[in-house]
Amino acid sequence: MRVKNAVNSKKKKKKILKFVKGFRGALRRRYSLAKQSYYRALKFAFDGRRNKKGNFRKIWITRINIAARNAGLKYNELIHGLKLANVAINRKMLAELAVNDPESFKEYVNIAKAALGK
């Protein structure tokens, strides 16, 4: 007697069709296309989680650069000056200070200027 494993295959199909419920057209109705779009969506989600880290870093650098230029330094000069002064602060914290606490950010700029000799 041949066993087709109907319960598990039905469960698998149900899971995928539930996931693609909001998709359009045949991607939602036909199992073979739904499966492809399901795996494609998971791939995009995986890639997005990886790209998010770089995107946030770009945003932080842009915010720091704007605030540093308002204080009279370029971004790369600020970072180099902080490294020369042995100040260990990451870009996320610098960006937070630049947006939410400009006075303390100016202190870091002054430390960097002193280390650079400006």
Swiss-Prot record:
Keywords, alphabetical: Ribonucleoprotein, Ribosomal protein, RNA-binding, rRNA-binding
Domain of life: Bacteria
Assigned GO CC terms: ribonucleoprotein complex; ribosome
Keyword Ligase tagged: no
Gene Ontology molecular functions: rRNA binding; structural constituent of ribosome
Xref: InterPro entries: Ribosomal_bL20, RIBOSOMAL_L20_CS, Ribosomal_protein_bL20_C
Pfam family, one: Ribosomal_L20
Keyword Signal included in the entry's annotation: no
Disulfide bridge positions per record: none
Family of the protein in this entry: Belongs to the bacterial ribosomal protein bL20 family.
Reported function: Binds directly to 23S ribosomal RNA and is necessary for the in vitro assembly process of the 50S ribosomal subunit. It is not involved in the protein synthesizing functions of that subunit.
Protein name per Swiss-Prot or TrEMBL: Large ribosomal subunit protein bL20
Natural source organism: Fervidobacterium nodosum (strain ATCC 35602 / DSM 5306 / Rt17-B1)
